[in-house]
Amino acid sequence: MKRIFLLIATNMAILLVASIVMSILGVNTSTMSGLLVFAAIFGFGGAFISLAISKWMAKKTMGCEVITNPRDNTERWLVETVARQAEQAGIKMPEVAIYQSQEFNAFATGPSKNNSLVAVSSGLLYGMNHDEIEAVLAHEVSHVANGDMVTLTLIQGVVNTFVIFAARVVAGIINNFVASNDEEGEGLGMFAYMAVVFVLDMLFGILASIIVAYFSRIREFKADEGGARLAGKEKMIAALDRLKQGPETGAMPASMSALGINGKKSMAELMMSHPPLDKRIAALRAS
């Protein structure tokens, strides 16, 4: 799975920096190849920087306490369960952490399959039974084993590149149109041009978010299938059913919630990073 705000803020910062650098360097939007190179550098660069610092960012933003020496039987069981599932999935043991939140949630993050973090909320850890928690952990381990962190980063890089490129191409067309109808042929001017680019960044960014959310929902179904293989289908179904009874989600930043077990509800399913729980349960029962 706050994640939506963090993701939007990160991407807006990337787009703003891209605009400033392009203006300073005098990148000509009519030169498609040059613009595309800049768009790709900032689009993929920002996405991969986010991936590289994802574990550090998750620990800081969520206040994750990594379990190095289990303090009680619950923590010991948690670490042992993740270790067993990681071995089954053929990945290196992730770091295991707990963060304080009453919501029933968990997430996986990290730059690679063999450098990852699996974290669970205190609400989930003490509000669900062992079978349900085992299934949740299996779901998160499956995210790691499926390489979903890198997959979603690549998708984010592509859509970032599209947003940067398309916004400036359209702004260039508008600028040329204004210049052709201006006696002095000056066009929009730098500040007006940047304002148009910013608005277009927002509009195309909404479309990009819908695309990323679509792929995220697909990965959720896959992680549910993987969780069912590692923990058992009935346990996975029971865990998803239990999530429906838990507190409303919303404390997790968007950069983590896409790889969480329980997504934030939205009136528009197109914008949801997770399919509705009923659909996920139905898909498991039909498999």
Curated annotation (Swiss-Prot):
Keywords: Cell inner membrane, Cell membrane, Hydrolase, Membrane, Metal-binding, Metalloprotease, Protease, Transmembrane, Transmembrane helix, Zinc. Signal peptide: none annotated. This is Protease HtpX. Binds 1 zinc ion per subunit. The chain crosses the membrane at residues 4-24, 33-53, 154-174, 195-215. It is found in: Cell inner membrane. Its EC number is 3.4.24.-. One of its GO terms (biological process) is proteolysis. Zn(2+) binds at residues 139, 143, 220. It comes from the Bacteria. Its cofactor is Zn(2+). One of its GO terms (molecular function) is metalloendopeptidase activity. GO terms for cellular component: plasma membrane. It is a multi-pass membrane protein. Belongs to the peptidase M48B family.
